[in-house]
């Protein structure tokens, strides 16, 4: 049995070699000749999986180590009897912490308290719901917009997009990409919506590039109307609009979900799915794969305020470390993908062990995902 895996999937060789012969390949483009001699294909979001890629090959199973699946033609796979699995929620925590890193940076730069801002979350799935929980733990007001969930009657106080645009100071998008249908998200953030953003608003897109009309956004930014923009995803990736990158506050190379933990979850989820598919079901404990974190222990004295949270969050991950490299190479062919391929190891807040002499600080940090304990001062 031969299994092709994307070369940027951590722990893939270690895990999938338990099931057969493993060959690592680049995700963009996949070497077609390798597909003719493989039984299974494990990819990331950079690989378009469809009839043109797989027709006539012996591939019997496709796994994507990603939460999103818009790069996979699931209907065609089903029609051909090819097994499929994604990794829903694998990088949700990573994306949430990316958003927090950006917001804490902007709050420090512009001198505002996050508790004084209302955050509109558009798309309340694995990422959006976790973001809501952490924001509300800090006492930050959230507005939720998720038309499909609202239509299903799911529990939650869902607002319309009009209400969110009208009331929110921050708009952060965490939707799938739907190019048509009743819940189309292609250019969900269009020229009309962009015009309606209040002065000083913050716009964050960490889901799919085409959710935001990049040309319309650039037009507003170059018109001198003050809004702050954080973009991790772009129309036309791996090519991007360099003028738009120059105009945004934070721009990164589609790496919001790129924590070591998130990548490892994605790999283990598709590994477990494939092992079940071939009748050799196995389960993997994530902690057995991950290395020790860079920082062993932090001691925190007193209550948790926003500047302290910012220091702790940025000790683990400061979004600016990914903004600067993209600006240096933007517009150079191949460099966008190279940044992703050679991405520096990044951990999640749970990797940071924080000893707190204040019980309320420990409790709040735990709600935010840190590995915090209360250790009274003596």
Swiss-Prot record:
Catalytic reaction equation(s): 4-phospho-D-erythronate + NAD(+) = (R)-3-hydroxy-2-oxo-4-phosphooxybutanoate + NADH + H(+)
GO biological process terms on file: 'de novo' pyridoxal 5'-phosphate biosynthetic process; pyridoxine biosynthetic process
EC number: 1.1.1.290
Active site: 208, 237, 254
A GO term, aspect molecular function: 4-phosphoerythronate dehydrogenase activity
A cellular component term, taken from the record's GO annotations: cytosol
Keywords: Cytoplasm, NAD, Oxidoreductase, Pyridoxine biosynthesis
Functional pathway: Cofactor biosynthesis; pyridoxine 5'-phosphate biosynthesis; pyridoxine 5'-phosphate from D-erythrose 4-phosphate: step 2/5
Cellular compartment(s): Cytoplasm
SUPFAM superfamilies reported for this sequence: Formate/glycerate dehydrogenase catalytic domain-like, NAD(P)-binding Rossmann-fold domains
PROSITE patterns documented for this protein: D_2_HYDROXYACID_DH_1, D_2_HYDROXYACID_DH_3
Residues where substrate binds: 45, 66, 258
Keyword NAD: yes
Enzyme superclass (EC): oxidoreductase
Chain sites annotated for binding NAD(+): 146, 175, 232, 257
InterPro entries: D-isomer_2_OHA_DH_cat_dom, D-isomer_DH_CS, D-isomer_DH_CS1, D-isomer_DH_NAD-bd, Erythronate-4-P_DHase, Erythronate-4-P_DHase_dimer, NAD(P)-bd_dom_sf, PdxB_dimer_sf
NCBIfam families membership: PRK00257.1 (NF001309), PRK15438.1 (NF011966)
Protein role: Catalyzes the oxidation of erythronate-4-phosphate to 3-hydroxy-2-oxo-4-phosphonooxybutanoate.
Oligomeric and partner information: Homodimer.
Name by which UniProt lists this protein: Erythronate-4-phosphate dehydrogenase
The species this protein was found in: Salmonella arizonae (strain ATCC BAA-731 / CDC346-86 / RSK2980)
Gene expressing this chain: pdxB
């Amino acid at each position: 049995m031969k299994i092709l895996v994307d070369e940027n999937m951590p722990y893939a060789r270690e895990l999938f070699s338990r099931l057969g012969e493993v060959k690592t390949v680049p995700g963009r483009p996949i070497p077609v000749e390798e597909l003719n001699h493989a039984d299974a294909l494990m990819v990331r979001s950079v690989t378009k999986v469809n009839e043109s890629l797989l027709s006539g090959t012996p591939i019997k199973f496709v796994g994507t180590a990603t939460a999103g699946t818009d790069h996979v033609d699931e209907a065609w796979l089903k029609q051909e009897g090819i097994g499929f699995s994604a990794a829903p929620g694998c990088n949700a925590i990573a994306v949430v912490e990316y958003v927090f890193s950006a917001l804490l940076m902007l709050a420090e730069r512009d001198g505002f308290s996050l508790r004084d801002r209302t955050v509109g979350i558009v798309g309340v799935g694995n990422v959006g719901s976790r973001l809501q929980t952490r924001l509300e733990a800090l006492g930050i007001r959230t507005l939720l917009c998720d038309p499909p969930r609202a239509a299903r009657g799911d529990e939650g106080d869902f607002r319309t997009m009009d209400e969110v645009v009208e009331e929110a100071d921050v708009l952060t998008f965490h939707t799938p990409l739907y190019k048509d249908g009743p819940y189309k998200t292609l250019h969900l953030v269009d020229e009309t919506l962009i015009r309606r953003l209040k002065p000083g608003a913050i716009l964050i897109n960490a889901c799919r590039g085409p959710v935001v009309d990049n040309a319309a956004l650039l037009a507003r930014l170059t018109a001198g109307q003050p809004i702050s923009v954080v973009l991790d995803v772009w129309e036309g990736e791996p090519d991007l609009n360099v003028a738009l990158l120059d105009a945004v506050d934070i721009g990164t190379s589609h790496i919001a979900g790129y924590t070591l933990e998130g990548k490892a979850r994605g790999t283990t989820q598709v590994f477990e799915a494939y092992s079940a598919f071939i009748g050799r079901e196995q389960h993997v404990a994530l902690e057995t794969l991950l290395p020790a974190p860079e920082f062993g222990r932090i001691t925190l004295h007193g209550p948790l305020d926003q500047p302290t949270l910012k220091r702790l969050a940025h000790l683990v991950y400061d979004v600016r470390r990914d903004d600067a490299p993209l600006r240096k190479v933007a517009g150079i062919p191949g460099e966008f993908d190279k940044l992703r391929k050679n991405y520096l190891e990044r951990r999640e807040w749970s990797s940071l062990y924080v000893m707190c002499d204040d019980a309320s600080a420990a409790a709040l940090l735990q709600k935010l995902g840190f590995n915090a304990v209360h250790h009274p001062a003596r």
